[in-house]
Structures are given as C-alpha cells and as structure tokens.
C-alpha cells in the first residue's frame, strides 16, 4: 500500500478535519489544455485515447502538472459500458456520441451481455493500474461510471438528446423493458466500479447527468432506485482504507434528502443549488461537492475569486466540503483561469478549518 501524501480529498468526503478545502475539476483533462490536444492527436481519436493505458494515464496526469489539485480522476468515458455491450459507439463531429445499434425494445435488452470488467473493459482497469503507479501516492485516484438511467438515455436515444422523447416513450409505454435494461446496467456498473476499486481507485463517483429531466416520482423509480442498488453492492473498503462514494445528479437539487438515504458518502451539487441550503438539508449525513458554475471560469480571475469566496462562505465553517465546478469545465476556458480558481480555493478556505 503506497502511503498517500495528500489525503485531503478522501478526508473531506468522510467529513474528517482538513487544513484547507480540497479541490478538483470535472473534465479537468480536456480540450482547454494544449497538451491534451497534442496527446489526443497522437492517439488518433477519443476512444483510442481511452483504450491506450499509457496515453490515458498521460492525460490524467497533465492537469496535476499545472495545478495543485487534491485528486486525480481516471480519464475515460461514461459510455464504455454500452460500448462493451456491443452497441457500436462512435463519435460524430459536432454531434457527440452515437450508437450504430441502439436499444429499441425488450428483445434488444434481453440480448445485451453484462460486460466483464477485466475482459471487454480490461483497458479501463489497465489505465487505473497505470495511473495509480504513476501517481506515486501524490493524490488519490477517483474512478467513475455513468448511472444506469444516464447510460440508458444514450442507449435508447442512440446518442445525445435534447428532449429524451424516445426513452420517455419506453418509460411510459413499456416500463418493464426499461426496468430490465436499468437492472442489467446496475449489475454492470456495480461490477465495473468494484473492478476499478480493486485495480486501485480510492474513491468512486456515479454521474447521473440526465436524472434531472425526470419528474420526482420517475426519478425515484428509474434513476435513484438503481443508484441505491449500486451503492449497496460496492466495496467500501480496500487497501486498509474506506472507499468513499459520491452521487451526482445534475439538476437534482430538489432530491438531496432522498439521495442522502442511499448510503453514499457525498453528493455532488450543480450550480443551481445553493450550497448553504444543501448543507442545512443534508450536511449532517453526507459531504457536499461543488458547486461553481463552470462558465464562471470565463470571468477575470478577480471575479472567479469572489465567487469562490461566496461559495466557501455559503458552506461555512467545518468539514465535509470538496470544492468543484457544478459540472465539467468548458473546452475554451483559459488554462490560467482554472489555475486562479484552484489557487483561490486553497488560499481562501484555510480560515474555515480550525
């Protein structure tokens, strides 16, 4: 077991004392960094980059060379599981991910395999092992997966969607087929995340990017229920340490109490939720991650610093806050603005920790 030199992030997730508020950024390996663009060009395309352990490791480490971040997150994609199920993932210029064989009916669902994390998804585990080795205990490594509902939206819609009419048609016209798909995905995600933990991920996060498009009742039945099943099935200790679990539903600020009942350690917040309100509601039960609007990084550094100060003051004194953006960093943000953000979090947060 490599001794962690900086365990602030893991401690904050477990609501333990820290010296300053830890910070990392979602999608922080990405197109806003010139070094990422160079590595992606070397790989040829996005999935080739994900499937090459050495290059995936390189782009995971790039932001850490620029910024004093408190955690690294595996460079991968949420659609690795549907890809491993044989749906034919490809990326259309300007349109994002697409599938050649989307799921259209119950018969399609029944044919889907549950992928072997060390087989079809072995390239992800190789990347986790490579990154852990190269991190040399500097900061913890976060593993992740999409939620069953979010993965299902891409699989049924055939790619990205604005209105989600195809999956909602299945949800209301053939709920049995959708539940079968979500159950299969929950089993797949549980196996996948546990394999990441065994390979070296020290914390895991479930991204429910599209849970917020559901009604409250549908969210409980079609998204949260399956995330709860996953949390129940996860390894919560490895290598002598607790492995914290974070749930993040974009647009899910109205359901924090229900999310906190799943047994997760932390909840991710998007920028539409007031962090002071969130702490009042669930801070006694879970840590909170977030939640600056990613577009704030277009502002001058002084304005970014003001926003960081406001969010820190909103959370207030004490433990259980991991600073992050409310979603992924945008691809055309000036890298020096991201640096100003990270520096401001560390400098301004010390006063909130005794």
From Swiss-Prot:
Residues annotated as binding substrate: 27-31, 46, 77, 154, 209, 327
Top-level class of the enzyme under EC nomenclature = lyase
Q: Where does the record say this protein resides?
A: Cytoplasm
Which EC number applies? 4.1.1.37
Name the site position(s) for Transition state stabilizer.
77
Task: Please give the pathway this protein is involved in.
Answer: Porphyrin-containing compound metabolism; protoporphyrin-IX biosynthesis; coproporphyrinogen-III from 5-aminolevulinate: step 4/4
Q: Name a biological process GO annotation.
A: protoporphyrinogen IX biosynthetic process from glutamate
Q: What does this protein do?
A: Catalyzes the decarboxylation of four acetate groups of uroporphyrinogen-III to yield coproporphyrinogen-III.
Q: Which HAMAP family match?
A: URO_D (MF_00218)
- Record protein name field: Uroporphyrinogen decarboxylase
């Amino acid at each position: 077991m490599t001794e962690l030199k900086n365990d602030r992030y893991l401690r904050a997730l477990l609501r333990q004392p820290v010296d300053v508020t830890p910070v990392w950024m979602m999608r922080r390996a990405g197109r806003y960094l010139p070094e990422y663009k160079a590595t992606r060009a070397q790989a040829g395309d996005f999935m080739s980059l994900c499937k090459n352990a050495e290059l995936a490791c390189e782009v995971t480490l790039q932001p850490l060379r620029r910024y004093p971040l408190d955690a690294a997150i595996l460079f991968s994609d949420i659609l690795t599981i549907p890809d491993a199920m044989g749906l034919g993932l490809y990326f259309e210029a300007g349109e994002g991910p697409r599938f050649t064989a989307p799921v259209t009916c119950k018969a399609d669902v029944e044919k889907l395999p549950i992928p072997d994390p060390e087989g079809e998804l072995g390239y992800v585990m190789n990347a986790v092992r490579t990154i852990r080795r190269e991190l040399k205990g500097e900061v913890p490594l976060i593993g992740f997966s999409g939620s069953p509902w979010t993965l299902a939206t891409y699989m049924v819609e055939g790619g990205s969607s604005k209105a989600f009419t195809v999956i909602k048609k299945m949800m209301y016209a053939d709920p049995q087929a959708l539940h079968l798909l979500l159950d299969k995905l929950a089993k797949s995600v549980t196996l996948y995340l546990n394999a990441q933990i065994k390979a070296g991920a020290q914390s895991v996060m479930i991204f429910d990017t599209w849970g917020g498009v559901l009604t409250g009742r549908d969210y409980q039945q079609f998204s949260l229920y399956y995330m709860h099943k996953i949390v129940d099935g996860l390894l919560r200790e490895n290598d002598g340490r607790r492995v914290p679990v974070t749930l993040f539903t974009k647009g899910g600020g109205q359901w924090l109490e229900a999310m906190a009942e799943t047994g997760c350690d932390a909840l991710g917040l998007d920028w539409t939720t007031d962090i002071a309100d969130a702490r009042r509601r669930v801070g006694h039960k879970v840590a909170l991650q977030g939640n600056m609007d990613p577009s704030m990084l277009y502002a001058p550094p002084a304005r970014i610093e003001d926003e960081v100060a406001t969010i820190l003051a909103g959370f207030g004194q004490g433990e259980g806050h991991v600073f992050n953006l409310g979603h992924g960093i945008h691809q055309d943000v000036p890298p020096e603005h991201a640096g100003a953000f990270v520096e401001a979090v560390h400098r301004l947060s010390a006063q909130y920790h005794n």
